[in-house]
């Protein structure tokens, strides 16, 4: 598991919403007055209770929804919601939804992963290169010819992510990617995400798992009724006031850090444990 990146000065915003608001049909605003940025190289965990607007936010960032007011920017430039503008956005930002069956529709794994690159009008050679690269990144090269309906749930998840990776996005947004996976499947997926990050992809993960967020992310964004609060993960997830408003509990690692410091076993300047292995190492 990679170490959280240490911020010096704010990384540039790859994609950002400024003053954005959105409501479904005639309903109340789901999000309003929203300022939110995905910064290059920062692993970002998006957390909040059901109905807090996480899915809406992800779809706004990826161009699936258009804010009623406000602006979506890509590299500092406003996104145009025409074919050219959305193609530019979707080659930079890719969203993978929670249920892989909502994204898989081709007969085989290889065909499904090739769909996006083919739609870009790339040559057959370039499509094959991208598909092979994406399958290898998700460790499913051996499944290229397998019918998608014969895949396990974990394999379907990986295939859906591979389809996004084949677009070579700079930002990959994942909605509950570890949901429904067994512990081994979760570990394998997290290792894959570490590999994508090492290759230069900025990853955003929506999750309800505060312990996973503490372990994996550099920054955490909490959706509360008052808006989105974003900051370095350990400090943000230690804010019991924010956690309460976001409908979340204190991560065990944060609780353990507080206990260790209270007993003089961990210096205030030292980083607290994010995993059971890190806690065990402190005890040695």
From Swiss-Prot:
Q: Enzyme group, top EC level?
A: translocase
Which segments constitute the ABC transporter domain?
15-250
Tell me the GO BP annotations in alphabetical order.
cobalt ion transport
A GO MF annotation of the entry reads: ATPase-coupled transmembrane transporter activity
Q: Could you tell me the membrane topology recorded for this protein?
A: Peripheral membrane protein
Functional summary from the UniProt entry: Probably part of an ABC transporter complex. Responsible for energy coupling to the transport system.
The name this protein carries in UniProt is: Putative ABC transporter ATP-binding protein SCO5958
Q: From what organism does this protein derive?
A: Streptomyces coelicolor (strain ATCC BAA-471 / A3(2) / M145)
């Amino acid at each position: 598991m990679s170490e959280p990146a240490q911020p010096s000065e704010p990384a540039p915003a790859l994609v950002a919403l400024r003053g954005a608001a959105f409501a479904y049909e005639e309903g109340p605003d789901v999000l309003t007055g929203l300022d939110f940025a995905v910064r290059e190289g920062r692993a970002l965990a998006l957390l909040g209770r059901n109905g807090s607007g996480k899915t809406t936010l992800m779809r706004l960032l990826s161009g699936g929804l258009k804010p009623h007011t406000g602006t979506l920017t890509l590299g500092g430039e406003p996104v145009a919601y025409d074919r050219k503008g959305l193609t530019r956005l979707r080659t930079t930002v890719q969203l993978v939804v929670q249920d892989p069956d909502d994204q898989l529709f081709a007969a085989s794994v290889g065909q499904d992963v090739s769909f996006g690159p083919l739609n870009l009008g790339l040559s057959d050679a370039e499509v094959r290169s991208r598909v092979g690269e994406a399958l290898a990144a998700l460790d499913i090269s051996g499944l290229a010819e397998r019918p998608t309906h014969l895949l396990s749930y974990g394999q379907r998840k990986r295939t859906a992510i591979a389809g996004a990776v084949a677009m070579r996005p700079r930002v990959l947004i994942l909605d509950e990617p570890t949901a429904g996976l067994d512990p081994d499947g979760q570990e394998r997926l997290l290792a894959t995400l570490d590999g994508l990050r090492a290759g230069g992809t900025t990853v955003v993960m929506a999750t309800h798992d505060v312990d996973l967020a503490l372990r994996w992310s550099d920054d955490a964004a909490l959706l509360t009724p008052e808006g989105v609060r974003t900051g370095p993960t350990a400090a943000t997830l230690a804010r019991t006031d924010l956690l309460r408003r976001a409908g979340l509990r204190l991560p065990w690692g944060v609780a353990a850090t507080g206990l260790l410091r209270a007993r003089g076993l961990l210096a205030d300047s030292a980083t607290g444990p994010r995993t059971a292995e890190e806690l065990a190492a402190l005890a040695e």
